[in-house]
Amino acid sequence: MTAKSMEELVALCKRRGFIFQANEIYGGLQGLYDYGPLGVELKNNLKASWWSSMVYERDDVEGIDASILTSQDVLGQSGHEDTFSDPLIDCKDCKARWREDEIKGKNCPSCGSPNLTEPRPFNLMFKTSLGPIDDGSSFAYLRPETAQNIFTNFKNVLDSSPHHLPFGIAQIGKAFRNEITPRNFIFRVREFEQMELEFFVQKGSDDEWHKKWTDLRVQWWLDQGINEDNIELLYVTGNELAHYSKATVDIMYKFPHGLEELEGIANRTDFDLGSHTKFQEDLNINSTVKQNTKSKSRLAIQDKNNNWEIPYVIEPSAGVDRGVLAVLNEAYREEIVDNGKKRVVLSFKPHLAPIKAAVIPLKRNDENLVETASKLKLELQKTKLGRVILENTGNIGKSYRKH
């Protein structure tokens, strides 16, 4: 069983301390959310599960944690300055703004007016000035994805942790997109976290690795408690493919608001390393890339014959927040108790559960029992099990159900 509506999940998340509207006491900020005591535990556990499967359980992946502020050179060379945009439409009457794909028919969803502007590109990246003088000459972007920092660190990682193909670089971190219309709770927001792996392979083996990573990623979501019946694979084709992609498979999930992307696995070919490398003309780059005159590193690897080649890249990219939403939805249960009342129960996989253990004395006014419970809690905490709590309400049944 899953939640019947997004409203049920939103109400539960606020009531139980999972997720709150950001800056709520001042009216809130659209598209921004804060994780509460239980939410941050669930989120951290999901990230830890991903990191374990991608890095700790493999011999061919290294991890990094790169800066959020990203130079114009990086995002200009990658194509983000030119192409990282959504088509924007304005209503001439009520002044509301919409993504083109949100306009059903020819009328404004807000006021019903047919007086709409033609779609125009709206760049989704946030800018910020660097240094004490804000004259527009020195600025950086808040990164719109974690991937580019991985590509620009390709040589650093190889020099410090040598690998042969295939190998990968993983990262979990914040990204920012100035969404035109954030919506559906934490599904589409302006500040979010990504879990991304860039897996470098030899050209010619990329199709095989793309299939392999798609299978691995589907299985990982099943291991997090996602019901297989709630997952579909979407094979992106034609004009829907990103400019850098040879092939993309989206893992689609049945969220309360509908079937939407949970994770994408893209074959990015040699576009990214080819965009950021120096000596482009010597490297037989297959993708169409911008000429690079500023890069100081050759982002390539030598083959068996000592010839330089640029690896192809397979990228599994998942949103942490979307993952939290999917896991919450799957965990949602409604039960009818003895008095006929409905209660909501969350049934998480043990490794994701926000609370790992609860110590509950049978009697709240028994000093010896409470003291023993407190000592037991301390011993459990020393095991680094995770979040351990002491619940001393005296109502054993209610406390047991709560945790």
Annotate each predicted stretch with a short phrase.
Residues M1-H403:
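NTP/phosphate- and nucleic-acid-binding module
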